[in-house]
Amino acid sequence: MGALERLAEAQISSDLSDNSMRLSDVDYLRASGWAAQTCPEGLMLYRLKYANDHREYAQTLRRVYSLAVGKAFRMRLTISHQDLHELAENTLRHWVAPICPSCLGRGYEKRPDAPMLTDKECSHCKGAGHLPLERAVKSNLKLAEWLALKLDSSMGAFIASARNATETY
């Protein structure tokens, strides 16, 4: 079982007892807390994407927006704050759920008269099941790609730190 799955399982566990002989659910929760000390945005992103906890969405969006402002300044882009906020929000939404809204990630069109799929590929995503980032943002694709990569990097750092904490625990 991977680190993400183990942490997700620990978060819904009813048994938070400590066991000195083996790793228990509480150890994985501790590890995520330790990992959050070095990578707090990674924990926010984990909660948003994998734990489906949208309570920190506004705070996460503010963080993504501030990253976008800094990078846009370094790239010397002339973009309004409203457009930059929209780009940050669309990039975050795409990062959290990149699946095609038309086919719900299945890649095929649904029959309108029955709860089943047709053999025709989805016209929105061309059978991929997910939409490319270009479809989520209107302009400044390079900035959006950088933001998505930064989100992946923060998430990866958080997972690696949590995994290391459980291995050395």
Predicted regions mapped to residue ranges:
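N-terminal alpha-helical interaction blocks
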Residues: 1-87
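Short cysteine/histidine-rich zinc-coordinating motifs and their immediately flanking basic loops
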Residues: 112-120, 134-141
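Short, flexible helical or helix-coil boundary motifs
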Residues: 14-15, 52-55, 68-76, 95, ...
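Long, charge-rich boundary regions
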Residues: 130-169
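The −1 position to Zn-ligating cysteines in a subset of zinc-ribbon hairpins
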Residues: 99-102, 121-124
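Cys/His-coordinated zinc-binding microdomains
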Residues: 104-107, 126-129
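Short, flexible, mixed-charge glycine/proline-rich loop motifs
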Residues: 86-99, 111-117
